[in-house]
């Protein structure tokens, strides 16, 4: 078994079964099951879902959406990524898998916007994201132009 790596998840019934493992692990707002079911096309490779398999099982996942323009108050001009629903199964937490997913997104070299959920602000701070508070809630933003050295070859997946 090789070292786990981040890969784009196919939208298919196998992935749907893998997502069911996450259903009881986190908050309802992290659930991707319904989102996947609504978009199921067998082996669609253009999915917004990314994950890490370990021993043949999905152990961590996130969704990434390309957006056109962030504008105020996010100080994002041009296209950016929205990172949603980052989740690692409890047995595999605190082992760097969440960081691997975020570093995969950072390698795309677009600004990244995310919402800190469930006491995760320390995680985002550690990964050089900056907090932004707006009426809609608290967000975290990462800018590649100010963080060009934030992802090293050793950290990248």
Curated annotation (Swiss-Prot):
S-adenosyl-L-methionine as UniProt keyword: no
Gene Ontology terms, MF aspect: acyltransferase activity, transferring groups other than amino-acyl groups
Pfam families assigned to the protein according to its UniProt record, in alphabetical order: Acetyltransf_1
Enzyme Commission code: 2.3.1.-
N-acetyltransferase domain sequence ranges: 9-154
Leader peptide range in chain numbering: none
The keyword Transferase belongs to this UniProt entry's keyword annotation: yes
CDD domains: NAT_SF (cd04301)
UniProt keyword terms in alphabetical order: Acyltransferase, Transferase
SUPFAM superfamilies: Acyl-CoA N-acyltransferases (Nat)
UniProt protein name: Uncharacterized N-acetyltransferase BCG9842_B1219
Source species of the chain: Bacillus cereus (strain G9842)
